[in-house]
Amino acid sequence: TGGGNYTLDGASITGTAADGSGIAVNGTLTVNNGTVVKGLATGGGNGVTVSGDLVTDSGDGISITGTAFSGDGVKVDGDTTLTNAMLNGRADSGNGVNIAGNLTTDSSTQVSGHAASGTGVNLGAALTGASVKGSSDTGTGVQLADNAVVTEAVLNGSSTSGDGVAVTGSVTLDDTSAAKLNASSTSGTGLKLADNANVSIQTITKVTQEKKDADGNPVLDADGNPETETITTQAPVTTPVTLTGTSEQGSGIATEGNVSISGIVLNGSTTADTGTGVSLGGNLTIADDISGVTAGATGNGTALVVNNASIHSDGYTDSGKDFVINASVSGNGTAIKTQGSSQLDEVVLNGNATGGGTAVELGGQVSGANITGTSDSGTAVRVTDGAGVDGSAVKGHSDSGTGLQVSGNASLNNSDLSGTTQTGTGAAVTGSLTADTSSQVTGSATQDGGTGVTVDGSVTGATVTGDATSGDAV
């Protein structure tokens, strides 16, 4: 269909193919009064392939529906313009909708894609305008692939057990599109920043002014009136935009591999006992001094997991600022949990637990960290079996619980562990702690009835200091 200047007025077109496109719509078309296009690919082809300019000047716009198995339900290929259009694509293992070419739309255009095991909507080009909704059962709702540029659009990605929204390459969003992004999953990851993801946010400014010629003189129309033009500029944001990811049973936000962010605060949360607000893995680079990470959980969930992660706060370091990650939990869960081997130089981790939970649980190998945990009645910092802490400062405070607890076989190197409490125990060693002579363990109780330090296990090498008001110092 297309290839020249044609008009489709209230037409209904259907097509079926195996490995090709059920229908190919291209060229310049005027599509009026609810024109309907439906395409089906029974093999590896695309249901409908769209390229060119499809404009509506009367009545409802075009409705394009494409269905495919391993191909694309609807594929936008090449530079395409749509007005008042509806794109609806479905696929099994392919893409419901694949925006492979630059797509410019108006705000009334809607793009909807669903895939069983594939990707609901895949975006690997420039998108301006449109409301985009992608969903998948076991795959990805919306994928922002390499070279995706999103401007003045609304993105909504959801998945049952996969990723709601996945970023897999270098992606730029304007601040309005980023603020409206919705990423959610039931048991998978709400927002995933995968290997090689590089996300930056731009602010767009439009100014209408009188048009000038090459000599700086006003350009006049046929009636002698000054012509105007709109000048668009873009620049990195100076105030970060919050990207939110939610998951009921999985991770609200997860990073893996090499990831870089600028102009963004990653905000992940979970409400399920088995869920995680934010999971940080791989190499995460904070490229400016305004981006950040916040995490939250309720019940028995975990707000933040740092698992085999190296966090590089280059932008903050260059500005002489501290990079702080805040995580909180309300209930019996954990605010911050470390696993694997993590390098946290120039990073401050703050965990807060209310309702009897644990603020920080240290596991695996942690180096270069500055960690603070606060709990009302639970454990502020727990050092678990097999943990190794190197070149780090760890502080815990619990009002009526335990400020610091070493509960397994752990090791310290050039590190200080301290715990404070009001009426509970400042520091408790119930496991086996091995340390070098430069490491210290201190505990303090500031009110009557509190205990500074209790040792029910063993401490080798470290200096142990306790202080209490009326209870036992050690």
Which role does the model predict for each range below?
Residues 31, 193-196, 201:
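Long, compositionally biased, intrinsically disordered segments
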Residues 24, 166, 254:
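N-acyltransferase acceptor-side catalytic subdomain
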Residues 202-219, 224-240, 468:
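Serine/threonine-rich low-complexity intrinsically disordered regions
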Residues 4-20, 27-45, 52-70, 78-94, ...:
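Beta-strand-rich solenoid/repeat architectures in extracellular/passenger domains
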